[in-house]
Amino acid sequence: MPSKKSSSPLSVEKLHRSEPLELNGATLFEGDALSVLRRLPSGSVRCIVTSPPYWGLRDYGIDEQIGLESSMTQFLNRLVTIFSEAKRVLTDDGTLWVNIGDGYTSGNRGYRAPDKKNPARAMAVRPDTPEGLKPKDLIGIPWRLAFALQEDGWYLRSDIVWNKPNAMPESVKDRPTRSHEFLFMLTKSEKYYYDWEAVREEKDSGGFRNRRTVWNVNTKPFAGAHFATFPTELIRPCILASTKPGDYVLDPFFGSGTVGVVCQQEDRQYVGIELNPEYVDIAVNRLQGEDTNVIRIAAA
């Protein structure tokens, strides 16, 4: 493996795509999720917490990006393939937590008008109405993905409603304003590690109870990014319930690195994979410390 650069507390290494990857502490890989996953050791992470790019939301201008597939079926199939490889990397008693948003059919409209204040939003796209749906239909992406993963062999164990008390208003007047997303808990095996006491809730009458499936978590903007980020308090229960200190947590769509932030706070190791080099830089700035390696996957 190439020697580490010493100009930064974060090491930057160039690897060829054919080389197998080893985990040695918290690591951030810059590269395509599926390509990196295929080179990670089997059974090496205890938990996966992630939020894939939403379908048809925006174009990040990056080759191999997810979310711009021409059909919903292609999008879902691609995610199933990625999570199938992630399952191999997961321990037999490991868990997968997936947050993904929904959307409405567009009536086959094209790109949105440019937005000078938010370039990422300027490239938001409206894919064609999926076959079998009508204009203005709620697409149902979260549940379609959950059922597709279940069909692929995952155990679908829980659907958590992420309720957003500070949800952004919408201009629509012919339906309620959306204020929630889904977070699915899936497992690789019938029996798995889950520490319910680590995430128990206080009862109004005193004492504690098992955590319920509606989580009230405010969205929080991150100043360094022009896109939505995972709230730390949405991620924390997933990690605490599914891992022990020192375990590895994987996020194959690392974004700004919030999973890594929570892992640092909770004494877990993390493995992040992020395709967009701008987001890698954002994550690096958030995670500055000698415990993090940044490995940039060479194109060759």
Curated annotation (Swiss-Prot):
Residues 109-129 are annotated as: Disordered. It catalyses: a 2'-deoxycytidine in DNA + S-adenosyl-L-methionine = an N(4)-methyl-2'-deoxycytidine in DNA + S-adenosyl-L-homocysteine + H(+). It is an enzyme of class 2 (transferase). PROSITE patterns: N4_MTASE. It comes from the Bacteria. Pfam families: N6_N4_Mtase. Gene3D superfamilies: Vaccinia Virus protein VP39 (3.40.50.150). Keywords: DNA-binding, Methyltransferase, Restriction system, S-adenosyl-L-methionine, Transferase. The keyword Methyltransferase applies. Its EC number is 2.1.1.113. GO terms for biological process: DNA restriction-modification system; methylation. One of its GO terms (molecular function) is DNA binding. Belongs to the N(4)/N(6)-methyltransferase family. N(4) subfamily. This is Type II methyltransferase M.Cfr9I. The gene is cfr9IM.
